[in-house]
């Protein structure tokens, strides 16, 4: 047999491995019975009382430690989502996540799970995005559009009425949030056409038709009219 785990730890000064050897669960096996490169899975117990299984070679070659102390695995009441971020854990979608619970993931897990906010919006995102980046519901925050809740037509129908029917292609007022920075085409009651971001129309300034407001020169408006005429011609 190659050098035993016991001799290896003494020679390399890694007595911590001997201290973490779970004598009770591994009995009658001892560190003197296995080589330091053994692929046998044995039990370990860290100084904080966490218990786990790992191959001997994983511990000696990779210098891996307790998966709970390093937050690679959840330990209920210590590093799980519920105990560390109880408020966020209340938005855990129990139905869509099936048997997975907030106690089964670490607080900064990269695992993608389902959430449901107080208003009933459902979305999927990694646990870490919620706890580390402090991101909440994307619909309530206006980062994603939800028809009937934060889309332009629902929130500001009077502005949506000026949405150009052809120049925006298949995009409709239902497909964008009322605070979107996306630039789209508009047409006023007088038939003037212009391009502006949705946010500039719905924000504090509530910018309307620049032609009616006298902000656009006749030359520029004529150019827009020519371009639109060519667009209609190409669509035929």
Enumerate the language-model features and the residues they cover.
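Functional cation/ligand-contacting sites centered on basic and imidazole/sulfhydryl donors
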Residues: 1-236
